């Protein structure tokens, strides 16, 4: 599993970035277990729009909302592309460990998502290379 999105950007070293939620990408089994363990709710994904996931859930019982996705895909150029990460960088947080994609993979993912806010994120992440 990986933390990605804005939270991963901060964990990678962007200290001036606002994190409204934590995005987690994991397997369908782990997604269901995490959502259940933190009293979240699995939400049916209509598969429309820019993103779709085999399992999607929100956890609102935590200090910051958590969005959990499994087998997430993004629509780019009319085609669906699976969101995957090759790297898994450990980051120590409050005596535990979280995993994030490398900065280079975070940049690639932002570009794949392609929204203006994602392209801005890619630009900000370039500072860390």
Task: Give the residues covered by each predicted segment.
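Compositionally biased terminal segments of proteins
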Residues: 1-129
